[in-house]
């Protein structure tokens, strides 16, 4: 069976919670499925880690996205996003090149199921609306924000 695996990051190196979870889910799924991995990288340095997930995948495609924080690329994206309906986090990962590659995989491969590793990748759902898909999330973001709000003293944050 063929599985399209969408991830906001390359899970390697396995050095934190997000990477741990994604890496081991990918590794476990690879025992049963042929994996077509599409991921994103904030930094050129991250591309050098693609060989570490290739043993689990038929194909690995990584696409650059704007790095989070105060840098020209992310600020430009944030400014443009003021005039968009979708949240910044979703727009950030929705790129024409990734869209084309996903369409190509879907056209050329008989994909049985799609694994969407984070809600931020939800804008791609229209490309595979006729396929079964699983959306996972790593955290309960509303709970994290609530806890942060209870402890933050600065009202401007």
Protein language model regions, located:
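Short, flexible loop segments at the rims of nucleotide/cofactor-binding pockets, characterized by
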Residues: 12-15, 89-94, 111, 157
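Short, solvent-exposed loop/turn segments at secondary-structure junctions
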Residues: 10-11, 42-44, 66-68, 119-122, ...
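Short, conserved loop/helix-junction motifs that constitute active-site signature segments
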Residues: 29-30, 126-129
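Short N-terminal targeting/anchoring amphipathic segment
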Residues: 102-121, 132-134
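Acceptor-binding helix/loop patch of EC 2.4 sugar-transfer enzymes
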Residues: 8, 72-89, 134-157
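Membrane-proximal helix-turn-helix segments that form the acceptor-binding/catalytic region
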Residues: 25, 100-104, 141, 156-157
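N-terminal subdomain of nucleotide-sugar transferases
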Residues: 1-63, 109
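A conserved catalytic-core segment of Leloir-type glycosyltransferases
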Residues: 40-104, 108
């Amino acid at each position: 069976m063929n599985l399209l695996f969408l991830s906001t990051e390359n899970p390697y190196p396995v050095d934190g919670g997000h990477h741990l979870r994604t890496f081991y889910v990918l590794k476990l799924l690879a025992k049963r499925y042929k994996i077509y991995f599409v991921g994103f990288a904030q930094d050129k340095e991250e591309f050098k880690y693609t060989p570490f997930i290739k043993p689990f995948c038929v194909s690995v495609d990584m696409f650059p996205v704007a790095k989070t924080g105060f840098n020209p690329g992310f600020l430009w994206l944030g400014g443009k996003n003021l005039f968009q309906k979708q949240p910044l986090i979703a727009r950030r990962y929705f790129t024409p090149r990734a869209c084309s590659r996903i369409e190509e995989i879907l056209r050329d491969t008989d994909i049985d199921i799609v694994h969407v590793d984070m809600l931020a990748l939800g804008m791609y759902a229209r490309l595979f609306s006729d396929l079964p898909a699983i959306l996972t999330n790593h955290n309960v973001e509303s709970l994290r924000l609530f806890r942060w709000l209870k402890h933050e003293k600065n009202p401007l944050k």
